[in-house]
Amino acid sequence: MIIPDINLLLYAVITGFPQHRRAHAWWQDTVNGHTRIGLTYPALFGFLRIATSARVLAAPLPTADAIAYVREWLSQPNVDLLTAGPRHLDIALGLLDKLGTASHLTTDVQLAAYGIEYDAEIHSSDTDFARFADLKWTDPLRE
């Protein structure tokens, strides 16, 4: 199973990002393939928050369009909406404790905890995931 990070979901949808073409192709291949995809609440709500923000994007998506993307992804047969299990909080807090910081890494820690809990691989263009020793992760856009 793979778990995509917010950045890849944004790059796949928002045409203004330089990574859009590669991310869009990767996401289409992944969603239409056989690999299990685990979507998390932090990634989905992060996508909605950023994709609709005029403070972040010159041409933000209308809320209805962003929600439609989320619903479309969740309707795919190889996509699961993951829920935090009984170890999730302990895993996440342990990761934060090892880092010695929360701040801008809090969402990354949440996603890493899902990855560890579900024995899944995080897909992200954010190299901060390399900080988590017990986590499998890759950047599918790396050339």
Curated annotation (Swiss-Prot):
Family named by the database record: Belongs to the PINc/VapC protein family.
GO biological process: negative regulation of growth
InterPro entries hit by this protein: Mtu_PIN, PIN-like_dom_sf, PIN_dom, VapC_family
Keywords assigned by UniProt, alphabetized: Hydrolase, Magnesium, Metal-binding, Nuclease, Toxin-antitoxin system
Pfam family, one: PIN
Function of the molecule: Toxic component of a type II toxin-antitoxin (TA) system. An RNase. Upon expression in M.smegmatis inhibits colony formation. Its toxic effect is neutralized by coexpression with cognate antitoxin VapB33.
Listed EC numbers: 3.1.-.-
Protein name as it appears in the record: Ribonuclease VapC33
Gene Ontology cellular-component terms listed: plasma membrane
Positions that bind Mg(2+): D5, D108
UniProt superkingdom: Bacteria
